[in-house]
């Protein structure tokens, strides 16, 4: 058994192979003390000088001490030198790495304990001899502990010692002390058998010598191949399977076949690892995790490797054989993969051909059924066979559409209707008169629309090269019959033609309906309008033009200009007493545009009405109202502004002049009141609500008020002044109520409005006067102007019992001597 574990030293081979070997080569300590005069010298004995290396050596003479040679005392027990606590290989390696920096700066001479055990002096040996000789087993060893207080154990516990565990930071010390076994006699070591204790057997189990020899033999077996001075290294074998070789070949092919793009030569810096790496392209970066290839050895490496054993020719041949074998494997793998791909491709093609063959067989079967149905159309053309009716043809087409829709669309079977259905439908419509029986044949044509017309051609135009079958049917069969009928039709006989077009409109394509209205009917209407004379024709033009409005709408606008021109020419010698003009023009009011209608009336009617009002004679004693009534009959035909303009220029000046003359000749104010109210009653509410008409009527009231106040005309009937004042007050109150009626209506609406909805004012005050009027209404205060009462040209108003006037948005209240400005709230408080 090796004792190197007691000395605490292990060599490199011990660390590598686990074998404990004591090295005897020249160490650093030997080199440092080679020229040291104080180092301990070893004297050669006579026997060593005589026999040399064959001299018998005594273990006691290896390292003599300075005390001289003394006799051996074999009665003393064996003393061992403690090597301290052994550390694990990882701890020793970490300790050596940590101490490399400090040792590199300064290397002090090794202490005495660092020298090899065989070169140490005998001081320690003497001490052990004295220690061994001074102690006698069997005596009262440690009796002095009985008289102490156990201070040592207490100190150890303070420093963290736990009884039953080893000393040290990690409790790496031994728990039980080293056991010593007393030798039976005075013989040498091993003379009395094994001297190992039970503790030694547990800590260092016995290893079979044969196993040690076998291990040593295996270790030294291959030493002849190694270079001298090199440590044993286990051979490293690299295995490459066929799958690895295929994968490597696939990646190589992919990298070679990858096209060089714009970013092929971009420099990429990879900082994802511990160290910064630079790649020449993104493809290199994508391969950073792939299995690296075995790089070729450098020249120095090959020389160093081949110094012990080198056969370059053999290595070249082996490498060449390996490469050829790899190429054969890759080529075979490629051929195998190609054959597999070919098999898969052929399998897919075979399956596709089988599917296509089945589809073709099914298509052939369907085509045979289609041919059998189409041949039924030809059966009716043969001699001796009855011709097919429209109903039978419709059933065949419906069967083709429902059961063979794909073939119907791809082969254009709908075009068969041109040769099959057209003759049958022409025969049915040959004797048809649209003006007598407009619904004849409508059901059959509607049935064929559902069969032949496609949704894509609903809004298509007339394209003779690619026309829908149904559109072609209508265009070639129905339109010629309709064209013949329209050419013989009288536009004034509007009813039958309008009924016919309205009846057939749902089944006609849009472009065909437009063609009938624009190309067939409109030219006939235009020709008839050109021949129309409003002075001689007894039938009004609107009676045969207006029925076309729902169908033609804006298409009739080109006819309106000639109609207005003819009507204007007919009104040149017209007088308002002739009411026929109003009957002719009234149906056209909603047909013409508002601008065109207003221009026509201003140019042709208003001047005639102005002349009629000019001829009106206002005579209070014998009044003729026919001219005035003739003008008022046109109120519904004219705009309010036109009527007010007529009255302002041609009626009110004459009417006010007659009133002034009457008031200056001792009038009867009761008759004047009735006369005023009579003329006012002839005006409509729309005219009375106009500001200009209100102004003229108020002017008449002012004239009457001034006449009563000044006593103009001499004698005045009793109560005339009060009657006139009452009339004025009543008229003003009516005007005031008319102004407030929209606001009251808004108040009523707000009362019935549900809570949470904000009231929207019907009219927003536009000036300060309107605001004062609104506040007066809110507080129930009467606010009205005073007749013929002014102050410095400003109208005076009564606000309750207070007289005020308004100037520049400020209310002035009449005081004792002057007019005082006040606020609106103060005015309301004073009025209450």
From Swiss-Prot:
Single Gene Ontology BP annotation: spliceosomal complex disassembly
Modification Phosphoserine occurs at: 209
PROSITE patterns in UniProt: G_PATCH (PS50174)
Region (Disordered): 1-21, 33-145
Compositional bias per record (Basic and acidic residues), positions renumbered to this chain: 36-49, 88-99
G-patch domain: residues covered: 148-194
One MF annotation (Gene Ontology) recorded for this entry: nucleic acid binding
One Pfam family here: G-patch
Localization annotation: Nucleus
Keywords assigned: mRNA processing, mRNA splicing, Nucleus, Phosphoprotein, Spliceosome
GO cellular component terms attached to this protein's record: spliceosomal complex; U2-type post-mRNA release spliceosomal complex
Role this protein plays: Involved in pre-mRNA splicing, specifically in spliceosome disassembly during late-stage splicing events.
Subunit: Identified in the spliceosome C complex.
Protein name: Tuftelin-interacting protein 11
Species this chain originates from: Danio rerio
């Amino acid at each position: 058994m090796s004792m190197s574990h007691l000395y605490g030293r292990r060599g490199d081979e011990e660390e590598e192979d686990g074998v404990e070997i004591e090295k005897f080569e020249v160490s650093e300590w030997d080199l440092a003390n080679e020229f040291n005069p104080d180092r301990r010298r070893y004297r050669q004995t006579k026997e060593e000088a005589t026999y040399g290396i064959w001299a018998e050596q005594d273990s006691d003479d290896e390292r003599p001490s300075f005390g001289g040679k003394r006799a051996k005392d074999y009665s003393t027990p064996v003393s061992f030198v403690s090597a301290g606590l052994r550390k694990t290989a990882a701890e020793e390696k970490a300790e050596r790495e940590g101490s490399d920096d400090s040792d590199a700066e300064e290397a002090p001479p090794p202490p005495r304990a660092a020298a090899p055990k065989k070169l140490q002096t005998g001081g320690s040996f003497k001490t052990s001899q004295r220690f061994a000789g001074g102690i006698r087993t069997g005596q009262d060893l440690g009796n002095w502990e009985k008289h102490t207080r156990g201070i040592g154990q207490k100190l150890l516990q303070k420093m963290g010692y736990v009884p039953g565990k080893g000393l040290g930071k990690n409790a790496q010390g031994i728990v039980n002390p080293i056991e010593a076994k007393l030798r039976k006699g005075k013989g040498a070591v091993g003379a009395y058998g094994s001297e190992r204790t039970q503790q030694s057997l547990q800590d260092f189990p016995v290893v079979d010598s044969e196993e040690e020899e076998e291990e040593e033999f295996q270790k030294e077996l291959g030493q002849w191949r190694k270079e001298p001075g090199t440590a044993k290294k286990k051979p490293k074998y690299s295995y490459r399977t066929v799958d690895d070789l295929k994968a490597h070949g696939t990646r190589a092919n992919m990298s070679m076949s990858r096209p060089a793009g714009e970013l092929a030569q971009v420099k990429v810096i990879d900082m994802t690892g511990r160290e910064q790496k630079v790649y020449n392209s993104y493809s290199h970066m994508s391969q950073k995790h792939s299995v690296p290839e075995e790089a070729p050895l450098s020249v120095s490496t090959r020389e160093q490797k081949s110094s012990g054993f080198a056969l370059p020719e053999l290595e070249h041949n082996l490498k060449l054989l390996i490469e050829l074998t790899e190429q054969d494997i890759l080529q075979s793998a490629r051929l195998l993969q190609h054959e597999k791909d070919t098999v898969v491709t052929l399998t897919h093609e075979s399956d596709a051909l089988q599917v296509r063959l089945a589809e073709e067989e099914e298509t052939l079967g369907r085509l045979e059924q289609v041919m059998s149905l189409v041949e039924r159309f030809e059966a009716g053309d043969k001699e001796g066979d009855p011709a097919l009716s429209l109903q039978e043809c419709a059933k065949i087409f419906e069967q083709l559409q429902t059961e063979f829709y794909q073939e119907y669309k791809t082969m254009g079977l709908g075009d068969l209707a041109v040769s099959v259905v057209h003759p049958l439908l022409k025969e049915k419509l040959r004797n048809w008169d649209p003006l007598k029986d407009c619904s004849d044949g409508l059901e059959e044509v509607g049935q064929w629309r559902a069969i032949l017309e496609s949704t894509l051609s609903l809004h298509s135009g007339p394209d003779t090269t690619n026309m829908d079958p149904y559109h072609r049917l209508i265009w070639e069969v129905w339109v010629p019959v309709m064209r013949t009928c329209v050419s013989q039709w009288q536009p004034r006989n509007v009813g039958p033609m309008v009924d016919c077009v309205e009846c057939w409109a749902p089944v006609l394509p849009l472009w065909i309906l437009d063609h009938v209205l624009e190309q067939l009917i409109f030219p006939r209407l235009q020709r008839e309008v050109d021949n129309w004379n409003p002075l001689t024709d007894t039938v009004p033009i609107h009676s045969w033009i207006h029925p076309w409005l729902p169908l033609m709408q804006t298409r009739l606008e080109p006819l309106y200009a000639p109609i207005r021109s003819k009507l204007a020419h007919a009104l040149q010698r017209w007088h308002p007493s002739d009411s026929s003009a109003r009957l002719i023009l009234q149906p056209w009011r909603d047909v013409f545009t508002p601008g065109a209608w207003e221009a026509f009336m201003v140019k042709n009617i208003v001047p005639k009405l102005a002349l009629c009002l000019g001829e009106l004679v206002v005579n209070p004693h014998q009044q003729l109202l026919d001219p005035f009534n003739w003008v008022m009959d046109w109120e519904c035909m004219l705009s309010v502004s036109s009527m007010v303009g007529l009255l302002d220029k041609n009626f009110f000046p004459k009417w006010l002049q007659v009133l002034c003359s009457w008031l200056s000749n001792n009038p009867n104010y009761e008759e004047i009141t009735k006369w005023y109210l009579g003329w006012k009653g002839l005006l409509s509410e729309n005219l009375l609500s106009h500001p200009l008409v209100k102004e003229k009527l108020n002017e008449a009231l002012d004239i009457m008020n001034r006449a009563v106040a000044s006593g103009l005309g001499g004698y005045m009937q009793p109560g005339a002044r009060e009657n006139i004042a009452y009339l004025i007050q009543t008229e003003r109150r009516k005007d005031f109520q008319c102004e407030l009626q929209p606001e009251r209506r808004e108040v009523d609406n707000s009362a019935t409005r549900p809570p949470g909805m904000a009231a929207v004012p019907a009219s927003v005050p536009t000036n300060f006067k309107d605001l004062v009027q609104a506040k007066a209404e809110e507080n129930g205060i009467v606010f009205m102007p005073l007749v013929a009462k002014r102050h410095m040209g400003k109208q005076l108003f009564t606000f309750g019992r207070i007289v005020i006037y308004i100037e520049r948005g400020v209310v002035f209240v009449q005081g004792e001597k002057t007019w005082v400005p006040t606020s609106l709230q103060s005015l309301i408080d004073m009025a209450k």
